[in-house]
Amino acid sequence: MTEQEIFEKVKAVIADKLQVEPEKVTLEARFIEDLGADSLDTVELIMGLEDEFGLEISDEEAEKIRTVKDAVEYIKAKLG
């Protein structure tokens, strides 16, 4: 799976979970500051990414995922 394909899937999960327009989901976007997520939203977001990609993301690793780019790079490394 290419980085672009991962980004498209991540974008869809984020847009759905955070109820934001897909155009607002850029690589630079921060979940809390830019996309309006709260701590519960971020937990649901991580769970959505786990389901979408068939991964398990530990709480420690999840805390490091703060931007869309963080999520894409993490998933790419895990799938790699």
Swiss-Prot record:
<feature type="modified residue" description="O-(pantetheine 4'-phosphoryl)serine">
    <location>
        <position position="39"/>
    </location>
</feature>
<keyword id="KW-0443">Lipid metabolism</keyword>
<dbReference type="Pfam" id="PF00550">
    <property type="entry name" value="PP-binding"/>
</dbReference>
<dbReference type="InterPro" id="IPR006162">
    <property type="entry name" value="Ppantetheine_attach_site"/>
</dbReference>
<dbReference type="InterPro" id="IPR003231">
    <property type="entry name" value="ACP"/>
</dbReference>
<dbReference type="GO" id="GO:0009245">
    <property type="term" value="P:lipid A biosynthetic process"/>
</dbReference>
<dbReference type="InterPro" id="IPR009081">
    <property type="entry name" value="PP-bd_ACP"/>
</dbReference>
<comment type="similarity">
    <text>Belongs to the acyl carrier protein (ACP) family.</text>
</comment>
<dbReference type="GO" id="GO:0016020">
    <property type="term" value="C:membrane"/>
</dbReference>
<keyword id="KW-0597">Phosphoprotein</keyword>
<dbReference type="GO" id="GO:0000036">
    <property type="term" value="F:acyl carrier activity"/>
</dbReference>
<comment type="function">
    <text>Carrier of the growing fatty acid chain in fatty acid biosynthesis.</text>
</comment>
<feature type="domain" description="Carrier">
    <location>
        <begin position="4"/>
        <end position="79"/>
    </location>
</feature>
<keyword id="KW-0275">Fatty acid biosynthesis</keyword>
<keyword id="KW-0596">Phosphopantetheine</keyword>
<protein>
    <recommendedName>
        <fullName>Acyl carrier protein</fullName>
    </recommendedName>
</protein>
<dbReference type="GO" id="GO:0005829">
    <property type="term" value="C:cytosol"/>
</dbReference>
<dbReference type="InterPro" id="IPR036736">
    <property type="entry name" value="ACP-like_sf"/>
</dbReference>
<keyword id="KW-0276">Fatty acid metabolism</keyword>
<keyword id="KW-0963">Cytoplasm</keyword>
<dbReference type="GO" id="GO:0000035">
    <property type="term" value="F:acyl binding"/>
</dbReference>
<keyword id="KW-0444">Lipid biosynthesis</keyword>
<comment type="pathway">
    <text>Lipid metabolism; fatty acid biosynthesis.</text>
</comment>
